[in-house]
UniProtKB/Swiss-Prot annotation:
GO CC list: extracellular region
Biased composition regions of type Polar residues, renumbered to the chain: 156-165
Secreted keyword on record: yes
Principal subcellular localization: secreted
Name the record gives this protein: Sericin-2
Keyword set, alphabetical order: Secreted, Silk protein
Coiled-coil ranges (or none): none
Species annotation: Galleria mellonella
Tissue: Produced exclusively in the middle (MSG) section of silk glands.
Disordered: region residues: 1-220
Subcellular location: Secreted
Highest taxon of the lineage: Eukaryota
Function of the protein: Provides the silk fibroin thread with a sticky coating. Acts as a cement by sticking silk threads together.
Entry annotated with the keyword Lipid metabolism: no
Length: 220
């Protein structure tokens, strides 16, 4: 269950795995690290200060341990990197029983490298991970979404939309051991020389196990 940008299990492109998210990007711009553990609604860190700099990283890590606590981590940086060579936005959420959701969305107007990853692992129910990258004119676009849950209802979604990018990769990886694992990955490139979309799903042991994956890409 590994694909183009090495998102397998519960770790994705920029090494946000489990409940700790470490994204050490060298450069002279902004780093916004928000980490919370064992709380009802942990951290939502948003960074809008990615001007034209060499590197910019926004890490939001949320971990909750006990039952009936919904740890959600949401990180949105929209349109904030003008001409940045490296811009990363990662969101990681881990909860051991119920309702761990992680969402990461990256919108870059003109960045040469833009990656958005959402990693989510939950031990029991209702684990959903969504990652979306939209670039207007970027040479490299990576969007990876990785979700692993031990029991029920694991769904991952990864989407990349490129207007004029030379490389566009979208990968979605999901593994669940019991029921209802669905992955969907789509990559649309209007004028890109390389466009890759891969989706892999594996489920192991259950009385009724459903696994569906759909992948579509188009380049002009």
């Amino acid at each position: 269950s590994s694909s183009t940008n090495n998102s397998s299990g519960s770790s994705s492109t920029n090494n946000s795995s489990g409940s700790s998210s470490t994204n050490n990007s060298s450069g002279s711009s902004s780093t916004n690290n928000a980490s919370g553990s064992s709380s009802s609604n942990n951290t939502s860190g948003s960074s809008r200060n990615n001007s034209s700099g060499s590197s910019s990283s926004n890490n939001s890590s949320s971990g909750s341990s006990a039952g009936n606590s919904s740890g959600s981590s949401s990180s949105n940086s929209s349109g904030s990197s003008g001409i940045g060579s490296l811009s990363r936005n990662s969101s990681s959420s881990s909860s051991s029983q119920a309702a761990g959701s992680s969402s990461s969305r990256r919108v870059s107007a003109d960045g040469s490298s833009s990656s958005s990853s959402a990693s989510n692992s939950a031990a029991a129910q209702n684990s959903a991970s969504s990652s979306e990258t939209i670039n207007a004119d970027g040479s490299e676009n990576e969007s990876s979404s990785s979700s692993s849950s031990a029991a029920q209802n694991s769904a991952t979604r990864s989407q990349v939309i490129n207007a004029d990018g030379s490389q566009s990769s979208s990968s979605s990886s999901s593994s669940a051991s019991n029921q209802a694992s669905a992955t969907s990955s789509s990559s649309v490139s209007a004028d890109g020389s390389e466009s890759e979309s891969s989706s892999s799903s594996s489920s192991s042991s259950s009385s009724s196990s459903e696994s569906s994956s759909s992948s579509s890409w188009s380049s002009a």
